[in-house]
Design a protein with these regions (language model features):
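Active-site flanking residues adjacent to catalytic metal/cofactor-binding acidic residues
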Residues: 24, 64-65, 147, 160
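Short connector loops/turns at beta-strand edges and beta->alpha or beta->beta junctions
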Residues: 27-29, 108-110, 165-168
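ATP-dependent carboxylate activation and anion-phosphoryl transfer catalytic cores
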Residues: 122-203
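Active-site nucleotide/adenylate-binding loops and adjacent lid/helix of ATP-dependent enzymes
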Residues: 1-63, 69-70
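Phosphate-binding site of ATP-dependent enzymes
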Residues: 43-130, 153-158
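Broad gene-expression machinery/nucleic-acid interaction feature
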Residues: 19-21, 72-74, 146, 159
Length: 203
């Protein structure tokens, strides 16, 4: 996990002693809401203005992290506990026309034209998959979701966030996209999620 801090009030920023660039996002939004190119923060003035604007707009604290410049992965997972398995790993690759450096709200909303999702299975992807599954199990997540990972400057995948209630739109949501690329039909994905929940309830 990258170094991080949480900002709710301007005074909180005074305590932040981290190396720039940093990355800012609301603590509890989905679909990239609040993430824009300005989320990559280069100095303290930007840190203050971006954080205070986010707190005001989204009415919640902001998480500040060391910016991770490497490859971004999202790992699909179905199942619970030791029965949790990866459905595949995709790399999120921003096209030239996309907003730079960040998997932003705009990039997600216009993913068909701005983002390439590539199913990957190289050593870095496998490392991301391993830690994503460990995070899923460690956090007690259930049935189906995603874990987002991004590599630091040394190529080490870092945990970014878990999505325990992911979007399941068959064409626009990341989890179904992963499954489709991995040869798992939408129907099978839904069946896996339901079967995991049924096993939990009737055991």
């Amino acid at each position: 996990t990258a170094d991080f801090a949480v900002v709710e009030y301007e005074e909180d920023i005074k305590k932040i002693d981290m190396i720039y660039p940093l990355f800012a996002k609301p603590v509890a939004e989905g679909t990239g809401k609040g993430i824009t190119p300005s989320s990559k923060i280069k100095n303290r003035d930007e840190l203050i203005s971006v954080c205070m604007e986010m707190v005001k707009k989204y009415k919640q604290p902001v998480i500040i992290e060391t910016f991770l410049p490497g490859r971004e992965f999202t790992v699909g997972i179905t199942g619970t506990g030791e029965n949790a398995v990866s459905t595949g790993v995709i790399e999120v690759i921003l096209r030239d026309e996309a907003e730079k450096d960040v998997y932003s709200y705009v990039n997600k909303e216009k993913c068909e034209e701005l983002v390439e999702y590539r199913l990957v299975n190289d050593s870095m992807a496998k490392e991301a998959e391993k830690w994503a599954l460990a995070s899923w199990r460690g956090l007690g997540c259930r049935d189906g979701g995603r874990v987002d990972m991004r590599s630091d400057a040394s190529g080490i995948p870092n945990f970014m966030e878990v999505n325990p209630l992911p979007g399941i739109h068959p064409e626009h949501s990341d989890l179904p996209i992963i499954c489709t690329k991995a040869g798992i039909s939408y129907q099978e994905l839904i069946e896996r999620i339901l079967n995991s929940a049924i096993k939990r309830i009737i055991r």
